[in-house]
């Protein structure tokens, strides 16, 4: 059943869900946004968002005006029972050309910010899409 629902007035893009829920009802949607810099002069996304489509509640975490986020992906915790039991991961790129980083946030507590940050040695070019593939699934399919 299709139902149109506005989750936020902020401009957002690259919606993602827990991929285990693809093709069936889901509760949580993860996006990126311009955040508090939601104006035409700021041309890069700097905020990750989590939307609960059942309650209408949203959480966000902003990296500030000198950073650009990539598409956020959901990675389920092994053995997870809840749809949002896992992590959110994204590349974060410095606008001044400094090395990029990968951030990991607890999907159930996104507003608390990253629980881990991987500081890369190089600047990864800004891209659009990301994916996560569990190495065990790769090994099963390609061994």
Map each language-model feature to its residues.
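Surface loop/turn motifs at the tips and blade-to-blade linkers of beta-strand repeat domains
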Residues: 6-11, 61-67, 118-123
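Generic long, charged, amphipathic alpha-helical segments
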Residues: 40-92
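Beta-propeller blade signature
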Residues: 44-56, 99-119
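Short, small-residue-biased leader/transition segments that mark boundaries at the very start
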Residues: 1-2
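Conserved active-site loop/cleft motifs that coordinate metal ions or position small ligands
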Residues: 29, 87-92, 101-105, 114-119, ...
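Structural signature of eukaryotic scaffold interfaces centered on beta-propeller domains
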Residues: 9-26, 71-84, 126-143
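Functionally critical, mid-to-C-terminal surface segments that flank or help form catalytic/ligand
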Residues: 13-36, 43-47
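Short beta-strand elements that form the blades of beta-propeller/WD-repeat-like
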Residues: 26-39, 83-95, 137-143
């Amino acid at each position: 059943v299709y139902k149109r629902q506005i989750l936020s007035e902020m401009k957002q893009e690259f919606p993602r869900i827990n991929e285990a829920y693809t093709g069936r009802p889901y509760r949580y949607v993860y996006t990126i946004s311009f955040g508090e810099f939601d104006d035409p002069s700021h041309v890069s996304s700097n905020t990750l968002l989590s939307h609960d489509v059942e309650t209408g509640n949203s959480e966000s975490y902003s990296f500030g005006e000198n950073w650009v986020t990539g598409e956020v992906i959901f990675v389920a915790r092994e053995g997870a029972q809840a749809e949002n039991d896992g992590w959110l991961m994204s590349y974060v790129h410095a606008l001044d050309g400094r090395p990029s980083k990968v951030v990991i946030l607890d999907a159930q507590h996104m507003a608390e910010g990253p629980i881990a940050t991987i500081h890369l040695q190089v600047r990864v070019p800004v891209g659009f899409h990301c994916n996560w593939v569990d190495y065990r699934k790769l090994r099963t399919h390609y061994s």
